[in-house]
């Protein structure tokens, strides 16, 4: 029997506000344990939450970016549960009136086609603290993360394979990153994914019993965990077994999933409206103000790069991987840079430099105008492509004008025959054995002279001019 895979994803995104959702404590990552806390985060008796308007701004932007309707009469709810990293014994979240609902995004499949994935809801809430279990037998609670603003984005169960889930996460991350509301760094916990997966026989309408997957710390692990679950559940069903409603975690060492707990039923969090916060009215003007701050999103940019600039779908996809990279590219083209040349540099030398240095493009001293200028002086013969790589490294580290640096560093390409011919003659004089080989008929010996000449000019000889002049002067040796 063959089974259809049903996948839905819950994605928690930390919002990059300066302060927490209901307290003035810093929301920045990486502080010493409990350094970013105050009486609200510790839930001292009598303290009251104060709404951070920036969180609602971010929620509106997310809802708009994900094609969602917005609840314009919005409130918060208490989600009641006890855990050591939750000192209030409840979480302030949203239940029946999330900020966004009924949305969708398009994903690109492996064959190049697109598929619409529906999004059920996006709700705002506060993050919980973090428990650390020490080797000394004690458990420690760090409340720096307590109260950091989150938006939880819950998809419909529209994905039919681990590959579709991977494509959805990739598209979702791009969109959220473009809005500027989060840096979506999974390694820092600012994007976290839980997956729900079930199987059903093809043709059956009812969903099967779902398994929830946690500990998915990368998109790759999401895909691997789901692939393992497809095989695990299919094997159980084919043998006549029954799938239990479980929470499992992905284990990188075994490349499989491990049981965490069996769910007896749906959790009862006893939601009720948060009495310490008012109803929030989101009027049309507020929504339009947030819409005006949104950029062009990746899909629109990719289509423009392909249609208007003649780039390939692959190049367009690479250039829109981050908003900073896409903005840099568009600025360079607006300054007169050839789109294909700019694209080649960004995907080649620039990408290699960024990977080696562990930086992002907005951390470079290189500017779009200096890259365009460098491409121009390659085209007009001022420098060779080889020298350009050296120039690029300087610009990436120090910035400035490409032409000014080339002139100051003496890197201008030598194209004048009056300068090159005497150097060629000196090369002949310094390499008599190679000249003798050439004269004796070893025609491949002429290739060695190119290397001798480039060495003598420290790589500054114009390759095309140098080849022509070498051929001319070598012929004279035979005449």
UniProtKB/Swiss-Prot annotation:
Its EC number is 6.3.5.-. GO terms for molecular function: asparaginyl-tRNA synthase (glutamine-hydrolyzing) activity; ATP binding; glutaminyl-tRNA synthase (glutamine-hydrolyzing) activity. Gene3D superfamilies: 1.10.10.410, GatB domain, N-terminal subdomain (1.10.150.380). It comes from the Bacteria. It catalyses: L-glutamyl-tRNA(Gln) + L-glutamine + ATP + H2O = L-glutaminyl-tRNA(Gln) + L-glutamate + ADP + phosphate + H(+); L-aspartyl-tRNA(Asn) + L-glutamine + ATP + H2O = L-asparaginyl-tRNA(Asn) + L-glutamate + ADP + phosphate + 2 H(+). InterPro entries: Asn/Gln-tRNA_amidoTrfase_suB/E (IPR017959), Asn/Gln-tRNA_Trfase_suB/E_cat (IPR006075), Asn/Gln_amidotransferase (IPR018027), Asn/Gln_tRNA_amidoTrase-B-like (IPR003789), GatB (IPR004413), GatB_C_1 (IPR042114), GatB_Yqey_C_2 (IPR023168), Gln-tRNA_amidoTrfase_suB_CS (IPR017958). It is an enzyme of class 6 (ligase). Keywords: ATP-binding, Ligase, Nucleotide-binding, Protein biosynthesis. GO terms for biological process: glutaminyl-tRNAGln biosynthesis via transamidation; translation. HAMAP family: GatB. PANTHER family: GLUTAMYL-TRNA GLN AMIDOTRANSFERASE SUBUNIT B MITOCHONDRIAL AND PROKARYOTIC PET112-RELATED (PTHR11659), GLUTAMYL-TRNA(GLN) AMIDOTRANSFERASE SUBUNIT B, MITOCHONDRIAL (PTHR11659:SF0). Belongs to the GatB/GatE family. GatB subfamily. Heterotrimer of A, B and C subunits. Allows the formation of correctly charged Asn-tRNA(Asn) or Gln-tRNA(Gln) through the transamidation of misacylated Asp-tRNA(Asn) or Glu-tRNA(Gln) in organisms which lack either or both of asparaginyl-tRNA or glutaminyl-tRNA synthetases. The reaction takes place in the presence of glutamine and ATP through an activated phospho-Asp-tRNA(Asn) or phospho-Glu-tRNA(Gln). This is Aspartyl/glutamyl-tRNA(Asn/Gln) amidotransferase subunit B. It comes from Streptococcus equi subsp. zooepidemicus (strain H70).
């Amino acid at each position: 029997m063959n089974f259809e895979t049903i996948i839905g994803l819950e994605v928690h995104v930390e919002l990059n506000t300066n302060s927490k959702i209901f307290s003035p404590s810093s929301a920045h990552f990486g502080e010493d344990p409990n350094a970013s806390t105050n009486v609200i985060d510790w839930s001292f008796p009598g303290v009251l939450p104060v709404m951070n308007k920036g969180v609602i701004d971010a929620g509106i932007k997310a809802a708009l970016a994900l094609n969602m309707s917005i609840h314009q009469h919005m409130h918060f709810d208490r989600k009641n549960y006890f855990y050591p990293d939750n000192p209030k014994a409840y979480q302030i979240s949203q239940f029946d009136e999330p900020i966004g609902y009924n949305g969708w995004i398009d994903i690109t499949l492996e064959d190049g086609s697109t598929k619409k994935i529906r999004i059920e809801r996006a709700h705002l809430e506060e993050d919980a603290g973090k428990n650390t279990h020490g080797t000394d037998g004690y458990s420690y609670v760090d409340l720096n993360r307590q109260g950091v603003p989150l938006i939880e984005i819950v998809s419909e169960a529209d994905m039919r394979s681990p590959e579709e889930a991977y494509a959805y996460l990739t598209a979702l991350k791009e969109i959220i990153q473009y809005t500027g509301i989060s840096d979506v760094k999974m390694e820092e916990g600012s994007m976290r994914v839980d997956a729900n997966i079930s199987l059903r026989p093809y043709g059956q309408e009812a969903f099967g019993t779902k398994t929830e997957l946690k500990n998915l710390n990368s998109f790759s692990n999401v895909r691997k965990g789901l692939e393992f679950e497809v095989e695990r559940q299919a094997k159980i069903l084919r043998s006549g077994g029954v799938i239990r409603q479980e929470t499992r975690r992905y284990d990188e060492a075994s490349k499989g999933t491990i049981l965490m707990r069996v769910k007896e039923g749906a959790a009862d969090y006893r939601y009720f409206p948060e009495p310490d916060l008012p109803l929030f009215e989101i009027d049309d003007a507020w929504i339009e103000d947030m819409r005006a701050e949104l950029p062009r999103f990746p899909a629109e940019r990719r289509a423009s790069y392909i249609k208007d600039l003649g780039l390939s779908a692959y190049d367009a996809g690479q250039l829109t991987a981050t908003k900073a990279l896409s903005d840099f590219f568009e600025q360079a083209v607006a300054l007169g840079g050839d789109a294909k040349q700019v694209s080649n540099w960004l995907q080649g030398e620039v990408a290699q430099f960024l990977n080696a240095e562990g930086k992002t493009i907005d951390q470079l001293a290189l500017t779009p105008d200096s890259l365009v200028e460098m491409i121009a002086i390659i085209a007009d013969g001022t420098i060779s492509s080889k020298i350009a790589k050296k120039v690029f490294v300087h610009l990436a580290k120090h910035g400035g004008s490409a032409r000014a640096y080339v002139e100051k560093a003496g890197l201008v390409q030598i194209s004048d025959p009056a300068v090159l011919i005497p150097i060629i003659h000196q090369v002949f004089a310094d390499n008599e054995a190679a000249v003798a080989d050439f004269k004796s008929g070893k025609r491949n010996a002429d290739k060695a002279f190119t290397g001798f000449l480039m060495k003598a000019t420290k790589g500054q000889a114009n390759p095309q001019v140098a080849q022509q002049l070498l051929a001319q002067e070598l012929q004279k040796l035979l005449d």
